């Protein structure tokens, strides 16, 4: 009997919604990346996009452990000499709450064409509302929340 190899057309995708309220950023990112890649499915193959869609709500209420709000920085470069700018994660969470969560999750995905394709299935929203009610997303519970 030949070994089963999953194909892109054989995949059934589910929609999950994750509430990020008081969840540590790294723990949320690991769970979301596993759902996006499809590592929770028995048909997982690293070369096939077999993952599910993930909606993250309340990204503005994410928790960070330790003093990361003030001591960890997000760097950007304009491309010009001396164009490096930095902003603390606390400042970035206030101004762009979805960007911090997206960057943490995308950093755990493959850095190739497949990773960019998987990244499109991630939807992050700062508040509690999202426009994907028609997809009937299943709530995904993350048990470890910040104390």
Swiss-Prot record:
SUPFAM superfamilies: Ribosomal protein L13
UniProt-recorded Gene Ontology molecular function terms: mRNA binding; structural constituent of ribosome
Complex formation: Part of the 50S ribosomal subunit.
Keyword Flavoprotein among record annotations: no
Keywords: Ribonucleoprotein, Ribosomal protein
Lineage: Bacteria, Bacillati, Actinomycetota, Actinomycetes, Mycobacteriales
Annotated Gene3D superfamilies: Ribosomal protein L13 (3.90.1180.10)
Family: Belongs to the universal ribosomal protein uL13 family.
HAMAP family: Ribosomal_uL13
Any GO BP annotation: translation
Listed GO CC annotations: cytosolic large ribosomal subunit
Domain of life: Bacteria
Pfam families registered for this protein in UniProt: Ribosomal_L13 (PF00572)
Full protein name: Large ribosomal subunit protein uL13
Function: This protein is one of the early assembly proteins of the 50S ribosomal subunit, although it is not seen to bind rRNA by itself. It is important during the early stages of 50S assembly.
Keyword Zinc attached: no
């Amino acid at each position: 009997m030949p070994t089963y190899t999953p194909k892109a057309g054989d995949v059934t995708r589910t929609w999950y919604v994750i509430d990020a309220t008081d969840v540590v950023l790294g723990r949320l990112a690991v769970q979301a990346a596993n759902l996006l890649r499809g590592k929770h499915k028995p048909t997982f193959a690293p070369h096939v996009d077999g993952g599910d869609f993930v909606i993250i709500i309340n990204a503005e209420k994410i928790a960070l452990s330790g003093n990361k709000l003030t001591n960890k920085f997000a760097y950007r470069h304009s491309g010009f000499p001396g164009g490096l700018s930095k902003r603390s994660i606390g400042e970035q969470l206030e101004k762009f709450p979805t960007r911090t969560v997206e960057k943490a999750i995308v950093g755990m995905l493959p850095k190739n064409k497949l990773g960019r394709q998987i990244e499109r299935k991630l939807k992050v929203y700062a508040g509690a509302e999202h426009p994907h009610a028609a997809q009937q997303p299943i709530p995904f519970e993350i048990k470890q929340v910040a104390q």
